[in-house]
């Protein structure tokens, strides 16, 4: 059974969960996972303040986020192996700087999906926001490897400063799609 983290109720203030990494939680007890500090506005609070936690990632190397996590940022950031499934919507920076593994979102994802990604696979069954696979502001390299699949629509500036990898959008894409210029 995977480790399941269920959002009790949607928050209006974003919760940043970059401290909840699959590589770390598969070695931790449920109580340790519940006490993991996450950023909520300008303070750090235990994960258990917003989420119910059950199961274990020790055997499956799988982490499941349940609920409308559209205000939950940095799910799967820096993922290197294993599988993350979001049963619902995902917030900004999904899979940012990941180097391996797989992330599946059954709903929509906000901006910066796969930002500065180095490898792995991200699939969003709904729509994605702006700057999919892009470099962060001031950065020089966006996505350098990996695969991002968006079944629905995606916003503006897809693949900004992207070097390698593949981004496929099944629906409509916004403005300023970045692509390599061909020599004349």
Regions found by a protein language model. Name each.
Residues 1-184:
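Long, distal/terminal scaffolding or interaction modules
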């Amino acid at each position: 059974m995977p480790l399941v983290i269920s959002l009790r109720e949607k928050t209006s203030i974003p919760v940043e969960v970059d401290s909840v990494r699959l590589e770390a939680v598969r070695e931790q007890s449920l109580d340790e996972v519940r006490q993991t500090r996450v950023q909520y506005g300008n303070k750090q609070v235990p994960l258990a303040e917003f989420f119910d936690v059950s199961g274990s990632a020790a055997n499956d190397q799988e982490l499941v986020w349940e609920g409308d996590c559209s205000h939950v940022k940095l799910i799967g950031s820096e993922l290197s192996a294993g599988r993350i499934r979001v049963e619902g919507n995902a917030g900004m920076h999904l899979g940012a700087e990941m180097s391996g593994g797989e992330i599946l979102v059954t709903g929509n994802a906000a901006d910066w999906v796969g930002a500065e990604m180095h490898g792995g696979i991200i699939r969003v069954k709904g729509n994605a926001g702006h700057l999919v696979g892009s470099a962060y502001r001031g950065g020089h390299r966006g996505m350098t490897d990996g695969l991002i699949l968006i079944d629905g629509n995606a916003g503006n500036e897809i693949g900004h400063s992207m070097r390698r990898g593949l981004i496929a959008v099944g629906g409509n894409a916004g403005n300023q799609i970045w692509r390599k210029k061909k020599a004349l």
